[in-house]
Amino acid sequence: MTIMRKSHPLMKIVNHAFIDLPTPPNISGWWNFGSLLGLCLVLQILTGLFLAMHYTSDTTTAFSSVTHICRDVNYGWLIRYMHANGASLFFICLYIHIGRGIYYGSYMYTETWNIGILLLFLTMATAFVGYVLPWGQMSFWGATVITNLLSAIPYIGQDLVEWIWGGFSVDKSTLTRFFALHFILPFIITALAMVHLLFLHETGSSNPLGIPSDCGKVPFHPYYTTKDLLGAILLLMLFMTLVLFFPDKLGDPDNYTPANPLNTPPHIKPEWYFLFAYAILRSIPSKLGGVCALVFSILVLALFPYLHTSKQRSLSFRPLSQTLFWALISDLIILTWIGGQPVEPPYIIIGQVASILYFSIILIFMPMAGLIENKMLKW
């Protein structure tokens, strides 16, 4: 008799994806973040669903409804803070996941990589529209400033902005449509994540050595299910520490003030996970140039498979490229810091240098380092 998981149509899909999946025997803890992202997504959808039951997407009551959730709903404060900090956790895992992909050359699986970039764009869009929903000062002005960037698009820009707003300014209709988008996008992300997995399982995972491991693969269960479970427990411990002890650490105090179109906050800035892109946007004096740089700062990831010049896939044995990789990480940290600072000297010049360095490392230095390392291998 055939085992049910190998014969039942639905169980077979689960079996091929999570139980009998052939997996490289040497993948490290850095490969845990894919499953942790799945956990974050489930967590966000569940907490978001319960928040949506009590939230009202109307400009007059949105702020009050969030207050009502925190004060009057059973464990509403916990659900709200889990959802708000869950977004930060999501992006931490996302950035580590992308970093691991760059370090170990996972971008050579182009279909999986490109769907991943699309997932990143969708996650950023979801987080942006979600940040508008509490209708605090930073929500309102963040929505105004970021959507206004689209007016830089020649010819159709202004019409496009007014079409997104549903009027001549960010108002009731904007909030309603942002709520609708924030509700539907996570389900689109879930569907795309499944396609992401589908393409990954066509090729199999890469490994730290960057060499084929077909001859020594092991089944996913029990080896990596236990490893993923450990990662999930550690992540949840870290997450609950953040939620229960430092719930407002990553938020903006301005968002505890109800939105007021007549009073502009002294310094408008997005959530911390967008600050690096915001710094790149601000470092270019031209509005259209800034918007192009902002989009390209994420889209540049799609060029990685074509900029790979080395004969080795992974950076494990490439000290020159390793140095550049960590320089890129340091540069992103500097950009994140600059994005949260006011537009004044010396921050302006630091932001401009860091932005130039960001694109230079990816587009010029890393491909050059690959070629130099190829030469060194011949010696």
From Swiss-Prot:
GO terms for molecular function: metal ion binding; ubiquinol-cytochrome-c reductase activity. Binds 2 heme b groups non-covalently. Its main location: mitochondrion. Keywords: Electron transport, Heme, Iron, Membrane, Metal-binding, Mitochondrion, Mitochondrion inner membrane, Respiratory chain, Transmembrane, Transmembrane helix, Transport, Ubiquinone. PANTHER family: CYTOCHROME B. Heme 1 (or BL or b562) is low-potential and absorbs at about 562 nm, and heme 2 (or BH or b566) is high-potential and absorbs at about 566 nm. It holds the Pfam family Cytochrom_B_C. It comes from Cratogeomys zinseri. A ubiquinone binds at H201. This is Cytochrome b. Heme b b566 binds at H97, H196. Its cofactor is heme b. Belongs to the cytochrome b family. Heme b b562 binds at H83, H182. GO terms for biological process: mitochondrial electron transport, ubiquinol to cytochrome c. It is found in: Mitochondrion inner membrane. GO terms for cellular component: mitochondrial inner membrane; respiratory chain complex III. The chain crosses the membrane at residues 33-53, 77-98, 113-133, 178-198, 226-246, 288-308, 320-340, 347-367. InterPro entries: Cyt_b/b6_C (IPR005798), Cyt_b/b6_C_sf (IPR036150), Cyt_b/b6_N (IPR005797), Cytb/b6-like_sf (IPR027387), Cytochrome_b (IPR030689), Cytochrome_b_C_euk/bac (IPR048260), Cytochrome_b_N_euk/bac (IPR048259), Di-haem_cyt_TM (IPR016174). PROSITE patterns: CYTB_CTER, CYTB_NTER.
